[in-house]
Amino acid sequence: MADEAKAKGNAAFSAGRFEEAAGHFSDAIALAPANHVLYSNRSAALASIHRYSDALADAEKTVELKPDWAKGYSRLGAAHLGLGDAASAAAAYEKGLALDPSNEGLKAGLADAKKAAAAPPRRAPSGGADAIGQMFQGPELWTKIASDPATRAYLDQPDFMQMLREVQRNPSSLNTYLSDPRMMQVLSLMLNIKIQTPQDSDFSQSSSPSQPPPQQQKQQPETKAREMEPEPQPEPMEVSDEEKERKERKAAALKEKEAGNASYKKKDFETAIQHYTKALELDDEDISYLTNRAAVYIEMGKYDECIEDCDKAVERGRELRADFKMVARALTRKGTALAKLAKNSKDYDIAIETFQKALTEHRNPDTLKRLNEAEKAKKDLEQQEYYDPKLADEEREKGNEMFKQQKYPEAIKHYNEAIRRNPKDARVYSNRAACYTKLGAMPEGLKDAEKCIELDPTFTKGYTRKGAVQFFMKEYEKAMETYQAGLKYDPNNQELLDGIRRCVEQINKANRGDISQEDLQEKQSKAMQDPEIQNILTDPIMRQVLMDFQENPRAAQDHLKDPGVAQKIQKLINAGIVQTR
């Protein structure tokens, strides 16, 4: 059923799983291809993962199916704005406002579009991965690659050209390609420093003639200043007695609301209730009076009355086609009241469902925070009901027996159950980390070892587990730091001392260049993802220091007298970027 797929999409969207949400909406569209709401929802999901071109196509389909629906133009504007077309975005928001002039979402979108159109191009930050990635912008990149004999042949390799274009589109994606020696060589060329890379790479063997660098066209949006001619002032309109009375009642209702707000701030809740009730009697076309009164009921602990007011606000808001933010606010207040009641009823499901509905109306941080709190409360409640240290110890012993028999997957199952029964036992995380290490699941092993240390910092097994994982991952400096941290609690621990000795041997071996080219490349690739390494390589002073090391050894020795420079050089040596011979 299309409704079922839509509900799954809404739930995934509320949880921030936008790719999954788009898939569910696609399933729903296959069942109901004429439903404009489904295209609108999928457009929002696609925009959330920056697939703006696809989001634009869905938004255009939404408007085509339902041209008198204001939210469709909101989706259209958001997609245009994501693609950098501020003018088209503004036009879309204006069309939506023509249908619903009071829509706050469209007003905010139009303001953002106008601001984007007027703003000068933003410069990227100068540090980190983005700063290095920015070096790949502009035609000088192609000139340098074409003029260097070592890199010229890369221009004839389609896969490498695709990587370069991806880095130009998204500078932060550079880390993804640093394991490719060609990219490391081009990075070395752009930084104007010599980075140690594997020699005689197969990628550089090509006799194909170099191609001229492609000319990149920089497209700049044209902006036209329009001078608005003053519109003639209309003649005063005659107002009927009925219309005049309606305006007076609305004005009186707003005064009652302001008085209610003042009483609420003073925590005079009974008086606030009276003012909001009077405002409702004067004007039943503004659901904020209901949501405000609901907020007072929450403070008074009258959760059933709060829920009743919120339900009325949602129903009346639908009838009036009120701003979806107001409807979302009513649902959030209802969810808050339900979460309060759940502390006694121990049923958080309906509160969670209500928060999810609120997020489909309008996604805002407060509602998302309350949803996360309700989900955590539900999880904690389930954990409390399942807690049993005695059964946890029994499962841990079963896991230990399976570990001795080298049945590691079975051991993990028992450790999992032990953790569910008692999540505060550091020993179980240590044992499970050992299983993961035996199975080669290093990230999981590292996570368990860190959890073990978090639960009991004095338990040295946690440090030996973590150090072992880092050693197997060839992160010898980090492993040594872990072993040293464990020695603070047990200075004579032989396992920790042996771990430090092994790390020192590997570090010295790497510093002498006594490792394979494959290991060197892997070490450099990991190092280039370290923000500290990235900042060192983009520091103009350090780049000059590295050039002096290659061209002026005497000046390089002077640089090493600066403790800060010496520390950074040692960091590059440890990372394999610089080698000593």
From Swiss-Prot:
Q: Where's the motif Bipartite nuclear localization signal?
A: 250-267
Residues annotated as region Disordered?
199-261
Question: Which part of the chain is the STI1 domain?
Answer: 148-187, 530-569
Citing just one GO molecular function, the answer is: preprotein binding
Provide the alphabetized UniProt keywords: Acetylation, Chaperone, Cytoplasm, Nucleus, Phosphoprotein, Repeat, Stress response, TPR repeat
Q: Where is the composition biased (Low complexity)?
A: 199-209
Return the Basic and acidic residues bias intervals: 243-261
What is one term from the GO cellular component aspect held by the record? cytoplasm
Post-translational events: Phosphorylated.
Q: Name one GO biological process term.
A: chaperone-mediated protein complex assembly
Quote the PROSITE patterns the UniProt record gives. Answer: TPR, TPR_REGION
Subcellular location(s): the record lists: Cytoplasm; Nucleus
Sorted alphabetically, which Pfam families does this protein's record hold? STI1-HOP_DP (PF17830), TPR_11 (PF13414), TPR_16 (PF13432), TPR_2 (PF07719), TPR_8 (PF13181)
Q: Where are the TPR repeats?
A: 2-35, 37-69, 70-103, 253-286, 288-320, 332-365, 392-425, 427-459, 460-493
Organism domain of life: Eukaryota
Q: Which InterPro entries match?
A: STI1/HOP_DP, STI1_HS-bd, TPR-like_helical_dom_sf, TPR_2, TPR_rpt
Q: Which Gene3D superfamilies match?
A: 1.10.260.100, Tetratricopeptide repeat domain
Keyword Ribosomal protein belongs to the record = no
Subunit architecture: Co-chaperone that forms a complex with HSP70 and HSP90 and preproteins (e.g. chloroplast preproteins).
**Job of this protein:** Mediates the association of the molecular chaperones HSP70 and HSP90. Mediates nuclear encoded chloroplast preproteins binding to HSP90 prior to chloroplastic sorting.
Comment field on protein domains: The tetratricopeptide repeat (TPR) domain, forming a carboxylate clamp (CC), mediates interaction with the highly conserved 'EEVD' motif at the C-terminal ends of HSP90 and HSP70.
Q: List the PANTHER family.
A: HSP70-HSP90 ORGANIZING PROTEIN 3, TPR REPEAT CONTAINING PROTEIN
Q: What is this protein called?
A: Hsp70-Hsp90 organizing protein
The gene for this chain is HOP
